[in-house]
UniProtKB/Swiss-Prot annotation:
Root EC class: transferase
InterPro entries: Glu_permease_IIB, PTrfase_EIIB_Cys, PTS_EIIC, PTS_EIIC_1, PTS_IIB_1, PTS_Sugar-Specific_Components
A biological-process GO annotation: phosphoenolpyruvate-dependent sugar phosphotransferase system
UniProt KW keywords: Cell membrane, Kinase, Membrane, Phosphotransferase system, Sugar transport, Transferase, Transmembrane, Transmembrane helix, Transport
PANTHER family from the UniProt entry: PHOSPHOTRANSFERASE SYSTEM TRANSPORT PROTEIN (PTHR30175), PTS SYSTEM N-ACETYLMURAMIC ACID-SPECIFIC EIIBC COMPONENT (PTHR30175:SF3)
UniProt KW RNA-binding keyword: no
EC code: 2.7.1.-
Gene Ontology MF: a single term: kinase activity
Provenance organism: Bacillus subtilis (strain 168)
Annotated ranges, domain PTS EIIC type-1: 116-455
The protein's name in its UniProt record: Putative PTS system EIIBC component YbbF
Length: 455
């Protein structure tokens, strides 16, 4: 069976175990997970989904999150989309709409909705950030090693290719933010341009000249969300024949004025507070701060709250050019790898060893969900010892102030995104987390009596 057929077969089985296409309210995907919102949750068989070949784990939260891994999730989602796109009967749609409204009311807590919006804005940008970050990082490493002159045309071309995204990132954030809040994507792009336009330097307000980029991605978010709501409000009063001319023009004019008077200063204040606050925590807290941040990241992953950190990482890179937080948090996955390997060594249960063997390769490559949801979390104590191991590695990263130049998956691949002069330090910290997670779990974290579910 070809790979495409495998993806189609897996998508078909997932759809069946989620209650069929008439039970699918909505679906999307991130880097590793297919996220499905069923109309009727009772029709989705999470246990059966976990047993499917190709499924690395299942998380039952406000959405049904099926962990498939990087790369695979794109193909399976595409196949899944084709399967659910067939037209449904009107009676099914009517009943489904009522059920969807009930589910939305149940899940529509402000905090969950906020995280969902944030994820939808920033997660689609991660592949571009990884690509640009890798090209930039590798180019800097080659130049630093003396293999290429910084003034050579090859180095200049590679630098331009890698840096372009970070120059115009505000435009992409504006597009996604406006679309997410019901506006026109092109107007969202204009909201981003309002912040990064070099001509801003000619504007002087309240006795001070404006700085291009001031407000950062926070300012872009404010402007893009504002222009989306402004557009919707104005459209209510404009005749359809004039809508295409009046609505975008007035929306842009109002948003531009409000952006320069309010959003840029406010966004700049918040951006400075986030950046200086985190840097102060790491500077003052040092090893202790690194330990706490590293040890508490995995519980955030379990609850899905880690998605809220994506704009923080981006803002750090946008503001100071690097991210000292990501290497610390990346130790969470490394602690899991060490803990899972300790269980693998100690256990005599074939089913458990098979589950660990399947999850370790992806864990080493920065995809920790299979080990978290398939091994350490169900066992209980190994999850805690993994967190402690992660904290020890996080303390190491904080002490040496290791930072990345872009965001991406953790584990070994993140070493390509670390500042070239700190790659060895990052890898050392990674292996410290592996070792700490292993030793703590081997000594205190596991007995075969804990694994009755793997009999």
């Amino acid at each position: 069976m070809s790979k495409e057929n495998n993806y189609h077969h897996l998508a078909q089985k997932i759809l069946e175990l989620c209650g069929g296409k008439s039970n699918i309210s909505s679906y999307t995907h991130c880097m590793t997970r297919l996220r499905i919102t069923p109309y009727d949750e009772s029709k989705a068989d999470a246990q059966a989904l976990r047993k499917l070949d190709g499924v690395l784990g299942v998380v039952e939260a406000e959405t049904l999150q099926i962990i498939l891994g990087t790369g695979v999730v794109n193909h399976v989602t595409a196949a899944f989309s084709k399967l659910v796109s067939a037209e449904e009967g009107a009676d099914v749609k009517e009943a489904a709409a009522k059920k969807k409204a009930d589910i939305n009311r149940k899940n529509a807590t402000p905090f969950k909705l906020f995280l969902r919006k944030i994820a939808s804005i920033f997660i689609p940008l991660i592949p571009a950030l990884v690509a640009s970050g890798l090209i930039t990082g590798i180019t800097k490493a080659i130049i630093q090693a003396g293999w290429l002159s910084a003034d050579s045309q090859i180095a200049i071309i590679l630098t331009v290719i890698g840096s372009g995204l970070f120059t115009y990132l505000g435009i992409l954030v504006g597009i996604n933010a406006s679309k997410e809040f019901g506006g026109t994507p092109a107007l969202g792009a204009l909201a981003g341009i309002l912040i990064i336009n070099p001509e801003i330097a000619k504007i002087s307000l309240f006795g001070e000249e404006l700085l291009p980029g001031r407000g950062g991605l926070i300012g872009v978010l404010f402007a893009a969300i504002f222009i989306a709501y402004t557009e919707q409000f104005i459209r209510r009063f404009i005749p359809q024949s004039l809508d295409i001319i009046v609505t975008p023009t007035v929306s842009l004019l109002i948003t531009g004025i409000v952006t320069y008077v309010v959003f840029m200063p406010l966004g700049g204040f918040i951006s400075d507070a986030i950046t200086s606050g985190l840097l102060s925590i790491l500077d003052i807290g040092g090893i202790a701060a690194g330990f706490i941040l590293g040890a508490t990241f995995l519980p955030l992953v379990v609850t899905g709250l880690h998605q809220g950190l994506t704009p923080v990482h981006m803002e750090l890179i946008n503001s100071i050019g690097n991210d000292p937080l990501l290497p610390i948090l990346a130790m969470g996955g490394a602690g899991q790898v060490g803990a899972a390997f300790a269980v693998f060594v100690k256990t005599k249960k074939t089913t458990l060893r098979k589950a660990i063997a399947g999850g370790l390769p992806s864990g080493l490559l920065g995809i920790g969900e299979p080990l978290i949801f398939g091994v350490t979390l169900p066992l209980g104590r190994p999850f805690l010892t993994a967190c402690l191991g992660a904290g020890i590695g996080g303390a190491f990263q904080a002490y040496f102030q290791v930072a990345t130049i872009a965001i991406g998956v953790s584990g070994l691949p993140l070493s390509f995104l670390v500042l070239p002069s700190q790659i060895i330090l990052y890898i050392v910290g990674l292996f410290i987390s592996y070792a700490a997670g292993f030793l703590l779990t081997y000594a205190f974290g596991y007995k075969d009596e804990m694994a009755s579910q793997f009999d």
